[in-house]
Structure formats: structure tokens, C-alpha cells
């Protein structure tokens, strides 16, 4: 059986058309299927629509989280409740066409543990977003010990072995595509063209993307801490030679003129480096603090899934 996890946040406008498209593609496969909606604190009527859809089809389930926990945690909740031996992660905004699932399932049948969808074309995305996304993936692959495929999102199919391994990763700052890459196992790609949204506006603002990028970097790399250390060594190196130059100018050249400019430049430069280092360390400490609290990753407000079905 394949479980299809759909994270939902304010998708009322385009959800019905996406579900129709998904249902059509499911009729073309021999796999038994369950569809799991994860309502991540939607402020529109998404939950009402989800409940109506679930009433009309016994294979459609829903999880209503107690508040908005974020896309990555919503997907994690869906994985936790999924019963299938294969789990497909896909957004419901229509940008990732459900028809690609047939190619992905064919690859799974070849023995792969993970099949991820790799974009060869992105519709309705600005040049800035495409450029920053490409730069980010290349940068992330440079500073981490794992390789996260470029031009991929969370659209993929994983098997039960991978899903169970993900459940053993308790960190609160989730970056699923990085976590799945870290797990290893046998992975491959299927190429596809990403479409424009079928309705509404994206919930992934630049602020949320920056937060996701920070989670990715701090979860898989110590590079920011090393940068702070190297900056400290660099400043100490420069400071040492400035001291030597000051002594040389004062006692050898007799050209030493006391003044505020050099002092202020030095203070501002060193202060900026110190604040940068403190900020980087603070990001890691904040994440340690979140994890040692040992709070649940999410809370379920209501669901039509049998509690015994989840792990």
C-alpha cells in the first residue's frame, strides 16, 4: 500500500481540483492507497473541505494539528501516521503533478529506497528565487558532509525502512530532504517539470525560506562556528600587526599621531566580528535549547485515523 501525505496550509482555493487530479492518477495504479491530509493550522476553510472529502472516501484520512507547526513538521506528522509500505510526500498546491508518481513507483519497483522528483523546469518562479535556490544548494553541499540533490524539494517516495529511520531522528528543527540524504540507503531521481500553483498564493514566504535555510545549515554543518573561530584568528592576526605598526610608527618613524578614526574603525570592526560570532553560536544554542526541552514535535487537535495505527 502507498500512503500519500499532503501537508495543508490555507489551500482551500485549489484543494478540490488537486484531489480530483490525484484521485484520477490513483485509479491508474495497482497500488492500494490511503491519502493523509495534515492540516497545519489553516486559517481558511481548508479543514471543513478536508472533512467533507474524507466523508466521501474512506481511504482519505486527516490530521488536524493543534496549531501551525510548519511545513516540515506537518509532513513528519503524516509520516508518523502513514500505514503504507511506501509513502509519497507531495504538496497540494498543484505545482508537483501527481502523474509523476507512476515513474517514481516504477523506480521503487527496481529496488530503490527513495525516489525523489528533480525539477528540470520551474514555472511561476522569479529569477531571484531560482538563483537563490541554486546558490543555496551548492553552498550547502560545499559546507556539509552530505550531498543534497540540487533542484529538489520534498516531493518524493520513501519506503517503510526509510520512514522508520526518520522516526529515530528526534530533532525539532526538521529539514527532511537533508535528513533523508543523511540516512543514505539506495536513492535515485525522476525528472519533471514543476507547474504553477493551481490557485491561491504560496505560504512559503521569504522569511520562512530563510528560516528553513538556517535549519538546514545548523542541522548539517558546523561551518558557521568554524567561521566565527577563523574570524577570531584573523582579527587577532590583524590586531597583532597593527600593534607592531603602531610601535614602529611611534618609535622609529616618529610619525605617530593619536586620533579617533583608527580607534573607532578598530572597535567597530572587532565589535562586528564578535557580534557575528555570538549570533552564530546563539543559533546553535537556541536549537539545543529547543531539543533539550523534550516537548512533542507536534500536537494533534483531531483526526479520523485510529490512534493504534500510528507509531
Language-model features and meaning:
Residues 63-67, 71-81, 95-179, 195-214:
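Acceptor/aglycone-binding surface of glycosyltransferases and processive sugar-polymer synthases
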